[in-house]
Every structure is written in structure tokens, then in C-alpha cells.
Amino acid sequence: MMQKQNMIVVNQKEIAKNIYELVLQGTLVQQMNEPGQFVHIKVAEGIAPLLRRPISICNVDQEKNEFTMLYRAEGQGTKTLATRKQGEMVDVLGPLGHGFPVEEAEAGQTALLVGGGIGVSPLYELSQRLVAKGVRVIHILGFQTKDVVFYEEKFAELGDTYVATVDGTHGTKGFVTDVIDHYGIDFDILYSCGPLAMLRALEGRYKEKKAYISLEERMGCGIGACFACVCHLQEDPSGHSYKKVCSDGPVFPIGEVVL
């Protein structure tokens, strides 16, 4: 159930170039039960920036009432968020959206988790949930260069993990699809989050597979009221039917929405 709460900053640190790990504490964590959901963060105390920032939930610890989120500090809002210190309060709205369907993967099956850039973040909680129910996980993490690689070791603790960098400075040179081809990776179910170009490439290959993708869209309200994040349905070529990424998603079955 969505709530609004001022949460305490437990810790914040830069874990890769311009990539920050922020841990917040509050009872709101008890509502975080679906990997792939997100929160809407008020990044500053004053009026500006006006809009909240949507950030994926990376890890949940309900025993400690803590959750972790990862984000890239690149605009005014996220750069402001990166200055928050331990003990300060952050205004959080969430959890929002529909997450990854863990129940679609069965014990003994193999799940392929493919993340690109900051889209790697929500796959960490998902991977933990899948492993807990006896699903074998394989991770492919795609980045531009080695300076922005994060959480490789954490994913490796859960299952086979491959990294691709566009410039070849770490792992396989190229894209996540190059890793799949090079190692001949097979799987029963696919979960993915990342840039549209990556999601389109996966959709072109695996439209007939059981697969789910999480969209990274700019949002205004985060609750489905402003229509800033609509996407059209593939089954309706007229373009009149749509879904809202913030409330109907951000996770959709592959092939459902136009990428």
C-alpha cells in the first residue's frame, strides 16, 4: 500500500562514477513486497526542483525497516539528493507501480536477469527473491565503461554473472546480447530493465519467450494522474490504447507495449 513518509538517511556513498547508494529507514519498508517497484523522492526541502524523482528499489530489509536505492547523479534533482547526509530526513512516496512477477518462475528453472546501466538496480532484490524459491539465476549486466560498473560482486554471490561494457574496458566488449551469443546462454524466463535500445533488442529475440521488462520513463506524479508516462499497446495500431508506466507498470510482459 502506498504511503508518504519522512525516512531517515542511514548511509549514502558513491559506489561508481556518479552512481550513489542510498539507504533509508522507516516503517514504509513494510509495504515493499514486490521487486521492481519504485519510490518517488522529494529531493530538496524547498520548492525547487518541483517534481519528485522516481527511483527503483534495489534491496529491502524489513527486519531493519531499511531499503536501498541506487541512482545516477546527473541532473539538478539527483545531484541535490547526493548531498544528503546520515541522519537527515528524506520525503518518500511509495512503493509505487507493479513489479516483476516472481511467481512466474518455478523452482528448478533458470531465470536470466539482464540489466543495463542504472537499470541493473531493481534486479538485485528480484534475484534474491528468485534464489530464495529455488530458481537458478544468471545475470548479465551492461555498462558503458568500467568506471560505472557496480554490484558485480553482489550479483555474483547469487548466481553466474557476466558483465559487458561498450568500450571493452571490463568484461565482454559490446552489448548484453553479445554476452548471450558468446556464452550460448539458455533460460526459461527473462527479466530485464534498462535503456529502450537494449529492451528492443531483447524483444526482437525473445518475443515468444516468457519475459518481462521494466521501463525507465520520466514521470510527473508517479500515481497515474498526469499522463506524462503513457506508452501505447502493440495490439492497437491506432495508438488509442495505452498504459501508464507509473501505475500499470513499470514492469510489462514483453511485447505488450510499444518500445
From Swiss-Prot:
Pathway involvement of the protein, from the record: Pyrimidine metabolism; UMP biosynthesis via de novo pathway; orotate from (S)-dihydroorotate (NAD(+) route): step 1/1
One Gene Ontology MF term: metal ion binding
Positions with a binding annotation for [2Fe-2S] cluster: C221, C226, C229, C246
Record flagged with keyword Flavoprotein: yes
Taxonomy, superkingdom: Bacteria
Domain FAD-binding FR-type as annotated: residue spans: 2-102
Metal-binding among keywords: yes
Cofactor: [2Fe-2S] cluster; FAD
Residues noted as binding FAD in the record, renumbered to the chain: R53, P54, I55, S56, L70, Y71, R72, G77, T78
InterPro entries, A to Z: Cyt_c3_hydrogenase_gsu, Dihydroorotate_DH_ele_sf, Dihydroorotate_DH_Fe-S-bd, Dihydroorotate_DHASE_ETsu, FAD-bd_FR_type, FNR_nucleotide-bd, OxRdtase_FAD/NAD-bd, PyrK_electron_transfer
BP-aspect Gene Ontology terms: 'de novo' UMP biosynthetic process
Cofactor note: Binds 1 [2Fe-2S] cluster per subunit. Binds 1 FAD per subunit.
Stored HAMAP family: DHODB_Fe_S_bind
Function: Responsible for channeling the electrons from the oxidation of dihydroorotate from the FMN redox center in the PyrD type B subunit to the ultimate electron acceptor NAD(+).
Assembly with partners or alone: Heterotetramer of 2 PyrK and 2 PyrD type B subunits.
Name of the protein this chain belongs to: Dihydroorotate dehydrogenase B (NAD(+)), electron transfer subunit
Organism: Bacillus cereus (strain Q1)
